[in-house]
A protein has these predicted regions:
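Conserved RNase H-like, two-metal-ion catalytic cores of nucleic-acid enzymes
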Residues: 1-115
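Mixed-charge, glycine-rich, non-catalytic linkers/tails in nucleic-acid processing enzymes
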Residues: 81, 112, 122-223
Length: 223
């Protein structure tokens, strides 16, 4: 069982790269937990969307040490509204890459594979053209499979490299204590339609900057 094997990896604090092919609905997932262990599981036959969500939730909630490596996590949080997932389960590789190079234009699997793996891969445009995820899924060729597997593989392969850079640059604590929780805060604001008070937001930004400065000072003093 693919999900059971992935859960064992996560329980041992090993990274599992995942990708979710979804728009309004989930159509497929891909899991990578070794160079040779790359799996694609589409919604098909007895494998229903609810089944995939249930198994993904079980896998995610097995992780307590950011072992689930995903890109653009906020886009996929609606999938888990009913089941619930723990923030500490995830490493958002795109957010981590942004911290390292905030001026880059893109943080997708193609950009990350080139920068951190020195590997050129087919882009989403090359694989899907102008098709949506749903259109590619309905067409039932291997383009969506390739996109899903490339994404989960790059997430998996880049995770340790990017984590090491964050730690070397003394940004990992910032990433873990501020950037990752902020993903869930922003999603909740979006979900519940919280009206943003500009003055309050400005005040919060000042507090956040102060906290970051204190954190940077503590890290510097400990170094």
């Amino acid at each position: 069982n693919v999900f059971e094997s992935a859960r064992k990896c996560v329980a041992d604090n090993k990274k599992v790269g995942i990708s979710i092919m979804a728009e309004k609905e989930i159509y497929a997932v891909s899991l990578t937990f070794d160079d040779e262990d790359i799996y694609y599981i589409p919604v098909y036959g007895f494998v229903l969307a609810d089944y995939l969500i249930e198994k993904m939730t079980e896998l995610i909630n097995t992780s307590k040490n950011r072992s689930i490596v995903i890109d653009n996590l906020k886009d996929y949080l609606p999938i888990f509204d009913k089941t619930g997932v723990d923030e500490h389960s995830f490493m958002d590789i795109a957010v981590a890459a942004y911290l390292i190079h905030p001026n880059n234009d893109r943080y997708d699997y193609e950009a990350l594979s080139k920068e951190y793996m020195s590997m050129l891969v087919m882009s989403r445009q090359e694989l899907l053209g102008k098709q949506s995820i749903k259109e590619a899924y309905d067409k039932d060729d291997d383009s969506l499979l390739k996109l899903a597997c490339l994404t989960s593989y790059v997430n998996y392969k880049c995770s340790d490299i990017i984590t090491d850079i964050l730690k070397k640059e003394e940004m990992y604590e910032l990433y873990e204590t501020i950037e990752m929780p902020l993903i869930f805060v922003l999603y909740d604001m979006q979900k519940f339609g919280i009206r943003v008070d500009k003055e309050a937001l400005s005040d919060y930004s000042k507090v956040l900057v102060e906290k970051i400065n204190v954190l940077e000072k503590e890290i510097y003093e400990e170094a």
